[in-house]
Each structure stands twice: as C-alpha cells, then as structure tokens.
C-alpha cells in the first residue's frame, strides 16, 4: 500500500476512490481536537466495508477480561474506550434514491486533509443507479478553539437532476464496537429528542456509567441563500435529527451546515449535560461557520508556530513529520491531567484506548522540548494520580512496603493487560516513568514537580526493584529473572540488559533526588518521608548495593552488551534472510518460531544506549548498533526513530535517513500493513525527535544544551524551535548553523566542541562540520 497518497507538504491527498482501501483511508483521514475524535468515514451511509468510529476523551467502559488460562494477578475487568454514538451522520436523498458510494458510480473523487488549517475536504462526482449525477463537497472540522464543537458543511450540486433533494442530519446512538464487541451494544439511550431548532441524544455506557450528550443545530442554504425549509423531525429510540429538503434543477447547490456540541460527564454534572450541549450548539449556530473556522485556524497556527519543523528538499519527509505532529495534537490537548494518549488515539479501538509507556518514551520529551506549555507535566501528573493503584497492583503480585508497579496498559490506574509475559514481566516500564520525571527536571530546570509529586513515584518504583531483583550466589551479582524486555519477541528471559541497566539508573536517580530535595525543599522532604514511611539509611544502603553489584551481560570479544541470557545461543542472521513475503513476521510466523529466532521487534539494548547516551562512548554505541540493528525487524512503531537517532549520532547519516523515513511515514505508507486498525499516535513524536535529537544531535550534558548537526544528502537544510530552561531557540541547519534566542534573556549553547553565549536579538552563526 506504499505511496498511495499524493505528496504535498501541507496536505494529505487521496485522488481516487478505492473501496478496498476504505478502512485504511478512514484511519488516515481521522479528525480530532483532544476532547473527541472520529475516523475519516463518510458522513453518509456506506454499505460496503467500513469502520465507523467516534471516540470521546476520558469516556471508558468496563470489559471483562478474556484469557484462555487464568493466572493470579490478572485483572478481573479492564477499561476500554467505547465506540461512541455517531455525531457526524448526514444522509443525502433524492426521489426514491439515497446516496451510497458503495452502490453508486464514483466518477471522480478527491479527499484532502489540510494540516495547516486542520480541515478535511471531500469532493466527488457521482451517478446514481437511475443516472442522476451530483457533485459533492464536504468540509469537516473538529474545532481546536472550541473543544466541544464539531462542524460539518455538506454541499450537493445537481448536474442533471431535477426534483427534491433532502439532507438528513442525525445523531445516531445505534453503534457497536466492531473490533471487540461487534454484536453487543455498549450504550444505553437515556433520552433523545428534538426542539424546533435542535436535536439531542443523551447516552450512558452499560458498564461504568459514563455519560455523554450530543446536541445538534443546523443551517440550510440553497445557492448560498439561507432557506428556512420546514424540517421533518426525526425522533427514534436511538436517533434524533431532522430531514430538510428543497426542489433543485441542474446547476443548483444546496448546503447543510451541521453544528454538533459534545458534552461528557468528565466535564459536566450529569444532570446538566443536555442543557450544556444544547446551549453550546445553539451558540455555535449563532456564531456561524466563518467565525468558528477562523478561530480554529488560529488555534492550529499557534501550534505550528511552536512545533513546526521545516525540511528543505524532501517533500515526503516534510509531509510525514507534519502529519505526525498534526495527529498527535488532534489526540491530546495537554490541558487535563486526567487524560493521557492511547497508542491509536481517536483512530481505532485497538489497545482499548489505554496508556502505555510509549507516552513517557516519545510524547513527554516531545512536549518538553517543543512547547513552553505544561503539557508534559500534565502527563506526569496523570501517572502520579495513579500511584496508589500502582502500589495496589504491585501488592497483588506479592510486593509490599509501598512498592509500585505501574500498569503496562491502563486508563484509570488499574492494569488492563492480560498476557502474563507482558502484564507480569515487562516491568521495565517502571523505569520509563522515572526517566520521564528526570527529563522534566533536566529540560525545565525546575524541581517543583519532583518535590510535590515525582519523588513519591521514584521511591515507590525503587522499592519495587529492591524486591524484584535476586542475588545470584554463583555470580555474586544481583540479577533480574523472568522478564520481557522492550523486545517483545523475547519472553520470560533472565537478565535482559536494558531492564537491568535501567533499574540501576532508576535507583541512582531516586538517590540523587532524595539528596537534592532534602537540601532544597526540607519541608517537602519531611512530608514525603512521613507519608512513604521512608527509612532512608536502610533503604538507600540496599539501593546502592544493587547499583554496585548489578549483573550486566556482555560479550567482551565483540565489545557488545548481550540482550539477555541465552540470546547468543540463537542462530544470528540479518533480516535479509527473511523471505519478503513473510514480513511482518508477526503476521506470518508462529509465536514459537518468533521466540526461537534472533529477530528483534524493536530497540532493546539500543534503547538503553539512546536513553543513557552520555554513559557510553561512540565506539561502544557503534559496535552494538552494527550488531543488533541488522537483526531488528522494526515491527514496533517505537523502533525506527530510536535507531535513526543512534545512527545519526555515530555518523551513519544515510542509514539514519532511511530509518527516519520509516518512522515518519509509518502510517502514510502503511509499513506494517495494519493501517486499517488505526494510526500509531504515541510513536509519532519520534519523527520530530529523530530530527532534533538525531540529525541535530541535541543533548543536555552537564546542564549545557549541546548540538552536533548533520544533514541527510537529500536535504538542503532544516529548522525547528526548541525549548530549554524556559528559553525558546530557533535553530536552522544548512551550510551554516544559525541559532537565535526568540524567548528568554541569555543561554549558553555548545555547538560541536565550542560553547557560545546566546542573547535575544543577537543571532549566532557557526559553520557546519562533516561528522560522518
């Protein structure tokens, strides 16, 4: 499915109608604004293969755990994001005919997603079975300035038809979850109805009792003049709306503007949902499309001004990186610490809409570096608020004394994963949360978050590791047994190097910040010691002993770290040995065959070298990269950008570029042949990080911002903004490196080996070096 879409730096363009790509296209053209989102399905009914999906942030339902072999510690229930009632539905009816692109001839078709403006456009010329020709034009906005509003402008022009055209906007509560519950209805309709100008639909999930209410108003035009046709009210058990129509002749155009307000029990008292949604829908109708669209465009412009990356000479890369930033912001606004980012966002039900450690790996550093807003901090507060349940989760698995194991998958703090080799064994996820807290302190230069929240998390995670390690008498070292590392194609192994190493670094981080907070925030330190019942002398001694005597498997002859015990016993061969028709291997091979192979799903050892880069010299990184990357199939969306960053840092710029393209266009070119299920939202910031931390070589060392830029051969230059210690820098890389301080007073920056002082209004220009 590669290269189906047209290349355009600001637009995603589909210029033909291909029914066999429908579900994938629906994923690609998804829209959202962080409060709600919807797959890019047609507004009108479509009788062939389609996945109509709508999702509302923070609204979940309890689903019973389904496993073949129950094990102690599995969750009884877990939360999932439900496919919400459909707010976008608009039917188009002629005399005795209804538009259905699966049944009508599609004479021309063009769909465009304008990423700069955040607007989806669809144009088509269609012919009905009776020979009636129409032209369609549809615009769709998930309003970024008004997070409860969705706007749809639906226009139809008669080419050869004479007669009545009716447009039927409805709110449809008759939906199911097609991925997991195709035959079960998740929603109960509490109330639905219409007034003279408004329709509403009030619903509740069958389990967990979350509620949402939609309200809809509309305006109707004929040849650009508003027409007050007598609407027919539609009031059914699970639907509410109107049918509005008028007589047309060839050349006439009728337009319906649908204003939808979406209110949920996350933000409103339940008894106020109808009133709140109706008031907002009516206010939107009064404000009008043009003003609401402009406010929406302005909101997107603010995002692009902060986070935009400009790439010169490579439209495919430019399109891809903008698409990834666009979809991330469509999923997460960053203004509510009760919310997080699901791997599929609002583009599909897979993974239940829950949170993984992907957030801390990719999203937190992106938001820390790309915007001065406290978006990343809200993601960290989300984890802090779930600390009590993480402690309870660890207790269920036999840990005590306030040890915490954060869930592999969650939306409410409770574990929502039920594969034992992941749920119980992929425990390295704990370290990623501590690492993200460290990144926050490093990049903001502030300690308030750690003093008020983060240190409690660090203590609880360190207590987990204190109990999870074992002491090997033969080795006289601490070992960690029965784990799954980041490479999920290796399960239940001993001494995964990344897990062991990141455990050490986690304990070191906790000890370091205990000392810092004790000095700088003595009152907070005393409070934390009290509520955690910390025995500093005893516990710190234990943690230091683990750090000093942790076993780290390595191969001295090759000069590499060994991924885990037993890995070197495998037949070691590159991915070139895999037949082309058997990729991705997780779609063609048995699990037994995958486990016995040497093939690596995603960065494992190399992830540790990326996160703790300054602890290793360049040659060590190069040796490990050259050993492990050829055996990596990159079948996790988290993999390509990590490898791209490391490749750029060790001078393999063109290899870095190929991996960057993989990360950047993973969904647009459907690398993993699974785009029909939704997008890979939480790995999308990786493409931005690959530019900033990879090609630009941005790192923080000893409190100094450092860059070592390189440029792929295809590019003539690139530029981006970055935030550090409350300062905003604009960095341009071409034949020269130009750096300006656009916000802030003064900052030192190291470019290659030299340190320069930046001041606002005084740009810095440095010659770029060849580091290959």
Q: What are the language-model segments listed below?
A:
Residues 76-129, 134-135, 618-622, 629, ...:
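Non-catalytic C-terminal accessory modules of carbohydrate-active enzymes
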